[in-house]
């Protein structure tokens, strides 16, 4: 929605200005003033948001220990395999947010109002992201049966189509300088331009939603470190792509994207099929119906107060406690009052036959 709203705003500002493909100082002041004001308002809203009704117990790790565990996790086999996925999202992000809009702006055969075209391209990308998000959200549980890897493969196919269309629609120098040249196969035109923008947003949503889902599922007990590594690779490769993009013609940038997209899709499928799914099959829950346990472990305060006890009793009565849940809890409880919580935990799950 943010891309759609921003695109509509930019279109109104650019379309009402007197210039065609140049931005006047008056327009610059309007844009910077509006976006600065909105950023301040957003920061204030975030600052005054209500706190949650309870405080979670903080981990007893120093910043140095937390940083060390993040670096150790960075070189594990799982993270090295997923690094290709994270890197691709960074390069792809630099393309649809920076390089592709530059191609639109520098391709003079599209017309004189290229700034307005940029705004409409933002709307098209936002619509692509929104529609992909709605489809994935509506499917919901069906996604788990379909498989995350199939959604990622769909996003990969969509992105590959975008890269091929970009090559056909834009001249080689469009990513570097203004040009009057035609595309490699046809004259640049707006319908194809907006279609590419829509598909870039659609594919980006397919990739990112499934990456977030994968990380939350596979590394729920180390979510902070995992997302830090994800952003490290994504932002690092996005920054690197912006550095080398002024020196590469469009076809070479697209070639890099195609290579990375194929390897990223392969890495995602390998991780999902040969690491995560076999592990889950070993720890699959029993088929008896009953109450699910929470996804997070009990805190010390909940163990001590007994607020968690009834829930464990109810779940245990249906035999819904799984090895996977207990393993995940154990990992998260290492830095809490372990003995107190686990004594309460196992006493409730396996009560003594001798009553008081």
Regions found by a protein language model. Name each.
Residues 41-227:
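Membrane-interfacial loop- and helix-cap regions that link adjacent transmembrane helices
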Residues 14, 18-19, 47-58, 141-145, ...:
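Transmembrane helix-loop junctions in multipass membrane proteins, especially transporters and channels
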Residues 1-17, 122-132, 230-244:
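Glycine-rich segments within core transmembrane alpha-helices of 12-TM secondary carriers
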Residues 333:
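Cationic, low-complexity basic patches in intrinsically disordered or flexible, solvent-exposed regions
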């Amino acid at each position: 929605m943010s891309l759609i709203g921003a695109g509509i705003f930019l279109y109104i500002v650019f379309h009402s200005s007197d210039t065609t493909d140049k931005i006047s100082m008056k327009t610059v002041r309007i844009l910077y003033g509006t976006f600065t004001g909105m950023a301040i308002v957003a920061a204030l809203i975030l600052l005054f948001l209500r706190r949650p009704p309870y405080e979670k117990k903080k981990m007893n790790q120093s910043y140095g220990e937390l940083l060390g565990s993040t670096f150790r996790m960075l070189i594990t086999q799982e993270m090295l395999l997923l690094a290709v996925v994270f890197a691709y999202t960074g390069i792809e992000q630099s393309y649809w947010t920076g390089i592709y809009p530059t191609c639109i702006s520098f391709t003079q055969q599209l017309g004189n109002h290229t700034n307005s075209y940029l705004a409409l391209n933002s709307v098209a990308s936002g619509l692509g992201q929104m529609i992909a998000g709605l489809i994935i959200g509506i499917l919901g549980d069906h996604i788990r049966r379909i498989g995350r890897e199939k959604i990622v493969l769909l996003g990969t196919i969509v992105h590959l189509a975008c890269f091929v269309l970009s090559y056909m629609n834009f001249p080689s120098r469009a990513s570097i300088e203004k040009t009057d040249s035609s595309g490699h196969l046809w004259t640049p035109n707006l319908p194809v331009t907006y279609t590419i923008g829509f598909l870039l947003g659609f594919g980006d949503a397919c990739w990112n939603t499934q990456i977030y889902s994968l990380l939350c599922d596979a590394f729920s007990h180390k979510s902070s470190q995992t997302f830090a590594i994800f952003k490290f690779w994504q932002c690092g490769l996005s920054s690197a792509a912006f550095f080398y993009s002024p020196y590469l013609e469009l076809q070479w940038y697209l070639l890099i994207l195609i290579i990375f997209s194929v390897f990223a899709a392969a890495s995602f499928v390998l991780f999902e099929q040969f690491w995560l799914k076999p592990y889950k099959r070993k720890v699959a829950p029993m088929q008896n119906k009953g109450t699910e346990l929470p996804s997070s472990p009990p805190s010390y305060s909940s163990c001590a107060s007994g607020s968690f006890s009834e829930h464990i009793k109810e779940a245990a009565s249906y035999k819904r406690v799984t090895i996977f849940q207990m393993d995940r809890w154990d990992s998260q409880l290492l830095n809490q009052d372990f003995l107190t919580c686990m004594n309460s935990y196992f006493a409730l799950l396996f009560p003594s036959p001798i009553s008081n």
